[in-house]
């Protein structure tokens, strides 16, 4: 079974842990308890293929920056999360993406931009178009708005990253073997 190392990044309080726990355990964590670093494993089926996801739920961008290079180096796919209710969390992601590209030393990194807390429409300050425009600037990066509370696009975030990783590095043994016939 293929393993996938996914990393959830973003500012403090955007809902990184809420999204991760909702995906892995199916529960919504109401209270804010700042994360240092949590790792979760979940087996899922994506496009008929069994996958073991290792999801690293990271500290907010303003804390524990020394650890960040290491999990950027080891991660295969990245969810960059902001809150639609806080402009600063959206603005913080540009530096984060640049850091990932620098550590990975490539522009082709499986990544998804996630506008979280879309259930709080009346508190929205970051428009959906802003997210779509930023995703376009980022080489047509995937983009979703989500809500851990309302279970909107939670699974899709992680499944999309798996699909991106599969496109970038196809599953070994999945391609049809070429058979040859030798006449002697």
UniProtKB/Swiss-Prot annotation:
NCBIfam families: small_GTP (TIGR00231)
Primary localisation category: membrane
Pfam families listed in its UniProt record: Ras (PF00071)
Extent of motif Effector region: 32-40
Family to which the UniProt record says this protein belongs: Belongs to the small GTPase superfamily. Ras family.
Native organism taxonomy: Eukaryota, Metazoa, Chordata, Craniata, Vertebrata
Top EC category: hydrolase
Any single Gene Ontology cellular-component annotation: anchoring junction
Modified sites of kind Cysteine methyl ester: 181
Keyword tags: Cell junction, Cell membrane, Cytoplasm, GTP-binding, Hydrolase, Lipoprotein, Membrane, Methylation, Nucleotide-binding, Prenylation
Functional description taken from the UniProt entry: Probable GTP-binding protein that possesses GTPase activity. May play a role in endothelial cell polarity and endothelial barrier function.
A single BP term in Gene Ontology: negative regulation of synaptic vesicle exocytosis
InterPro entries attached to this UniProt entry: P-loop_NTPase, Rap1, Small_GTP-bd, Small_GTPase, Small_GTPase_Ras-type
GO terms of molecular function: G protein activity; GDP binding; GTP binding; GTPase activity
Reactions the enzyme catalyzes: GTP + H2O = GDP + phosphate + H(+)
Top-rank taxon: Eukaryota
Subcellular location: Cell membrane; Cytoplasm, Cytosol; Cell junction
Removed propeptide positions: 182-184
Protein name, entry field: Ras-related protein Rap-1b
């Amino acid at each position: 079974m293929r393993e996938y190392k996914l990393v959830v990044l973003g500012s403090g309080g955007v809902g990184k842990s809420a999204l991760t726990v909702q995906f892995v355990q199916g529960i919504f964590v109401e209270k804010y308890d700042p994360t240092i670093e949590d790792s979760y494993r979940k087996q899922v089926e994506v496009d008929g293929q069994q996958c073991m996801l290792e999801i690293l739920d990271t500290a907010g961008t303003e804390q524990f920056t020394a650890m960040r290079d290491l999990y950027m180096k080891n991660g295969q796919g990245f969810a960059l999360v902001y809150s639609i209710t806080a402009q600063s969390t959206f603005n913080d992601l540009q530096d984060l993406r640049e850091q990932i590209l620098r550590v990975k030393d490539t522009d082709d990194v499986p990544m998804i931009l996630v506008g979280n807390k879309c259930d709080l429409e009346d508190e929205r300050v970051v428009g959906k178009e802003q997210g779509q425009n930023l995703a376009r600037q980022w080489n047509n990066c995937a983009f979703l708005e989500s809500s851990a509370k309302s279970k909107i696009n939670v699974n899709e975030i992680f499944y999309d990253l798996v699909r991106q990783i599969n496109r970038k590095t196809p599953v070994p043994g999945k391609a049809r073997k070429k058979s040859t016939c030798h006449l002697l």
